[in-house]
């Protein structure tokens, strides 16, 4: 006996084998889809009922708030605000000044257009009061008279000025004028020859006018080059 039955496949008019068509049960499919939708709606409604709002929190609404106090509206319109809040919560410090500087703090500058300068020191470079003088000992004018080349030479050579050179006045102390035929005493102080001899002969004061040492009327002439070295 034959175990299997023979199947006869119909051929189309062209001679090709026609594929069998499957029939779908449309009524059953629609009923199944309706059942699935009903189950999903029931489960979603039950889930919403289970979640209760926490005390102190507002329910979300679709009303958009306008202004600076709006939190939901700004968050929806500007997503960058959400990033800023997350950055602050992460602990990042804000950049820039937190508070403006106080208005009470102001800077004031005072310029003295008429300073109290010692007249004797300005004219002659010597003052009898010394460091105890209450006026300023400034030699701005004498500094401007110096040539630039000599200042540059002193900077390059880095020579330390002697105390004797610092104490030499650039004008005669007796007449308050430039030196005319200058002379130097034993104590290395400069005077005009006329002023020194007038003080020694007429006033009969043999002591030095600056240091008070007895000179005995002895002095030595000073050349122009030596005078420039002593004054500069």
From Swiss-Prot:
Record's compositionally biased regions (Polar residues): 67-88
RING-type zinc finger locations on the chain: 172-212
Keywords: DNA-binding, Metal-binding, mRNA processing, mRNA splicing, Nucleus, Spliceosome, Zinc, Zinc-finger
Function: Involved in pre-mRNA splicing.
First and last residues of each zinc finger (C3H1-type): 112-140
Pfam families with a match to the protein in the record: zf-C3HC4_3, zf-CCCH
Predominant place of localization: nucleus
InterPro entries: CWC24-like, Znf_CCCH, Znf_CCCH_sf, Znf_RING, Znf_RING/FYVE/PHD
GO annotation (BP), single: snoRNA splicing
Gene: CWC24
Cellular localization per UniProt: Nucleus
Subunit annotation: Associated with the spliceosome.
Region (Disordered): 1-107
GO molecular function, one term: zinc ion binding
Highest taxon listed in the record's lineage: Eukaryota
Family according to the record: Belongs to the CWC24 family.
Record's protein name: Pre-mRNA-splicing factor CWC24
The keyword DNA-binding appears for this protein: yes
Record-level GO cellular component terms: Prp19 complex; U2-type spliceosomal complex
Keyword Zinc included in the entry's annotation: yes
């Amino acid at each position: 006996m034959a175990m299997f039955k023979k199947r006869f496949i119909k051929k189309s008019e062209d001679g090709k084998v026609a594929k069998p068509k499957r029939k779908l049960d449309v009524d059953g499919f629609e009923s199944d889809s309706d059942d699935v939708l009903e189950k999903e709606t029931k489960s979603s409604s039950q889930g919403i009922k289970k979640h209760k709002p926490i005390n102190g929190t507002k329910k979300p609404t679709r009303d958009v708030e306008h202004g600076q106090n709006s939190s939901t509206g700004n968050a929806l319109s500007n997503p960058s605000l959400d990033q800023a809040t997350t950055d602050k919560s992460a602990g990042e410090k804000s950049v820039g000044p937190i508070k403006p500087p106080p208005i009470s703090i102001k800077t004031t500058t005072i310029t003295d257009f008429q300073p109290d300068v010692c007249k004797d020191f300005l004219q002659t470079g010597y003052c009898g009061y010394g460091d105890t003088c209450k006026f300023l000992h400034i030699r701005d004018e004498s500094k401007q008279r110096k040539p630039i080349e000599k200042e540059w030479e002193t900077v390059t050579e880095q020579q330390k000025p002697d105390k004797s050179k610092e104490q030499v006045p650039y004008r005669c102390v007796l007449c308050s004028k430039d030196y005319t035929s200058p002379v130097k005493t034993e104590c290395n102080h400069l005077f005009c020859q006329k002023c020194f001899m007038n003080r020694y002969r007429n006033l009969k004061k043999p002591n030095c006018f600056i240091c008070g040492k007895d000179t005995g009327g002895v002095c030595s002439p000073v050349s122009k080059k030596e005078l420039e070295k002593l004054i500069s």
